[in-house]
Amino acid sequence: MSPRSDSGRSAGVARAAACAPWVRTRLRTAPAAACALGLLVLVTAFLAAAFPRAVDTYESKGLRHDLVVEDPRRSVLELTAPPPALGVEAARAAAVRETALGAVHRKVLAGLPEPVRADAFQSSYGIRTTEPIAAGEKWLPRPYGLDPKLTYATPSALPAHATLRDGAWPTVHGEVTTTATKVEAAVTEETAKALGLKVGSTIAVPTRGEEPLTVRITGIVAPKLPGAAYWSFERLLRTPALVPTSSKGPPLYYWIAALLLPPDAAPALLSTTGAPEPYWRIAPDASRLTALEVDRLRSRVASLESGPELLKLRALAGPAATLTTDLDVVLTRYDALRSAISPVVTVAAVGIGAVAAVVLLMTGGLFAARRHSELALLRSRGGSLRGIGGRLLAETAVTAVPAAALGLLLAVAAVGPARLWPAVVGATAVAVLVCVALPLGTTLLHRRPRLHGARDDMMTARPSRRRTVAELTVLVLAVGAVAALRRRGTAAGGGTDFLVSAAPVLVGLIAALVLARLYPLPLRLASRTVARLRGAIGFLALARAGRASVSGAPALLALLVALTTAAFGGSVLAGVADARDDAAVRATGADARISGEGDAMPMPDRLVRDVRKAGGVRDVAPVQIEYGVPLPSDDPGVEDAKGTTLVGVDPGTYAKLARATGIGSFPADRLKAGGAAPRKGTLPSKDRVLPVLASPAVAERLGERPRDIRSQAGDFKVRVVGTVTRTPAVDTAGFLIVDAASLTHRQTTTLLVTGASLDAKALRGAAHRAGSTFAVQLRAEERAAFVDTPMQSGAEGIYAAAIAAGAGYALLAVLLSLLQTAPERTALLARLRTMGLTLRQGRRLLGLEAMPQALLAAVGGLLVGWSTIVLLAPGVDLVQLALSSGPGSDALDTAPLRADPWSLALPALGVVALAATVAAVQAWWAGRRGSITELRAGDTR
């Protein structure tokens, strides 16, 4: 082989080596960095894609939940029509038979406009009497001497919705006409028990003809799903009721019940006096509804009630048909809850999104710092900014795009069915941010040559005019956002105002900018103090902290925003829990409450003794409650018609209860009356004046002078000695609290029990032995009744995830900030070890160096989080998020946002602990390595 051929082959190999793919070479050179970037992009893309899907999912589940648990009397759509007009009796009878009504029913269900969908199984049709008809049979029960009244209906598919308990299903024998005199019927078990009906019983129904219609009971049935729409839209079909008369004077009650006829017996009802009418009841099917269809659903329901869709229904059911429903009310209530929750959730999303963006930019800054020398060399050898940027873009895209796509797939798989495009937009935004920001930020650093080793620290940095203008702009936005949030709350005209939702982020950003400007001042003061002390470690650590690069400012920003978001989210969850606790306490007044109907039943002394002996009982406060006590008026002979509530208490035990619950605490001696208390059953002296505590409204009404009070507990004079806005015994706006020992007619009507781990079984047993009218309410059970709806639990889950993600990104920001300067600190330790620095001193040096920024971020985050909550609390109301379900959902008018100490302190302490841990680990790792590689000649670090 000739030398020439050898030289040509060598040149070809050299050219091949020079043209080696950049991306493949970089990935092989630094696989760990590429994997770390990919993992960060994966997690961030997953969060960005999962958030909109989670919101869609819990909003849709909340809508379905509201429609399913709603009373069918509000959610069912009922189509009614007048009975067939007078004319040929055969035609009238045919119009109400099952064949005709069933055909209309099927056409109505098939013609419902989307997204109104029917649950065909729970939907029903038939004919019913709209006016109850009195039954004159002597054997029927008459509690007040009044005849019971019965309604008659022919519900479709009765055997599919009920179980036959006795007898046989009612049928028709031959063809029933309008002149029929005998039909069969069934009744439910509850109706049979209440009215004394049994198989074979007959009821004579008056008609417009000469002979009555005889209805014979052939079967006793039990509903399969009593709470479903088939039985619960008209509860009279399954459950009879005692109804009061509407006449003046004391109410008299009579029974009202329903008899169930077979569908083809409907013509017989046309001759009765009960004003029969055909009906078609459409139970909504919520299984496929989504939150995006709420507006369309409301529009279609309105059209069905009075619009073009109603005309279509009239073409099927008759020109006078009408459709009635309260489904639009249910949708309005759902919209109100969603409008109250969505802006609060958006606050968490904006906060975490801002922190994630800052952390991604910090990652790019770390990569730029680590590759500064390499790219500077490329630039010095003729590399163009466009060429370098293109290679960095390709290198970043190879890692970021697949990671973002994988995060999107994981979010789609992990979160339930929802819209796809918001998730795609979120994951794409993360990929674009990484692919654009990282190469662009790295390339812009090499626009012009920079002097090697020039100082770039926070101590000597002088803010430019552009930075000052930008900071002032952010300040104006923050002030505007906070002012808007305080003035009109989180809701913005039914939508979400992102400027308002970004208020916590903007406050954190302003705080970061202020702290970055103030950072040199405490360092200078500390340096002067340390300079006078013995030893060089402290002074050297502060000097190193002062030389910290301005690139540490993004870390401070990320930490403050993350800590603010975590504090806000934790305070939201704590506020929800506090509101539910408060509502539970208002419902019971203590850990347990024992009372009769209307708090008016006197309790035997034995009940009080048995309750005191029950397990877990610490104290019992007997209370006498009387509602509707008239207040005196300044006009002679005129009294307050509404009255107030009189609460007779034992001052000692009741004052202790008020302090324990935090509701209207007061000193017990304020209720002590002068002189001897009247004996039981005796009239008090006319000159005796009882001190009372009153609500503000009642106190204003009574004034400061003694006033006469007339009540069932006695007639006496009272003087207001103090006011309390609330009291444990009653949850009313107006009340008077008086010493029960001073009342003439003393009796205990309510027991307020305090104690830990109360024995509910023993308390209920004691109450039952005292009488069946006494009931026991437990505070724990009232609290547990506030079960989260899917929308509430979804919003709380997002806030919990926001807290966790905020903490994770905050810790990652600390880690990235320390890793960015890790090579410089490692070289410093190597040089100082040659001067006699010990391992222990090295750990102290790195720990003290990391502490200023960590403490600044921790203390700043704690203060900023607290101040943010204080600033935004007037505009954030958590009552919808906390109390949209449960027995006391209207117990609180408002549930303000309150700072949660743990949510403020724990993340801040975590930042300090992580900074100290990373510094200790780095000192330990540097101590194990040799110093040769760190002491290379010409190294400028």
Feature locations, PLM:
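Alpha-helical transmembrane segments, especially those used as permease/efflux helices
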Residues: R4-R9, A32-A36, T44-A50, P267-T272, ...
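Short helix-loop junctions at transmembrane helix boundaries
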Residues: T396, A405-G426, R488-L499, L862-G910, ...
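Actinobacteria-biased recognition of intrinsically disordered, low-complexity terminal regions
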Residues: M1-T25, G318, A614, D635-P636, ...
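Membrane transport/envelope proteins' first extracytoplasmic loop
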Residues: M1-A354, T490-S501, V514, A584-A592, ...
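Juxtamembrane segments of multi-pass membrane proteins
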Residues: R488-K680
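Interfacial "coupling" helices/loops that link adjacent transmembrane helices in transporter permeases
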Residues: A30, V358-A397, A813-A854
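Short beta-strand boundary microenvironments
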Residues: I133-L195, R609, R618-D619, V623-R705
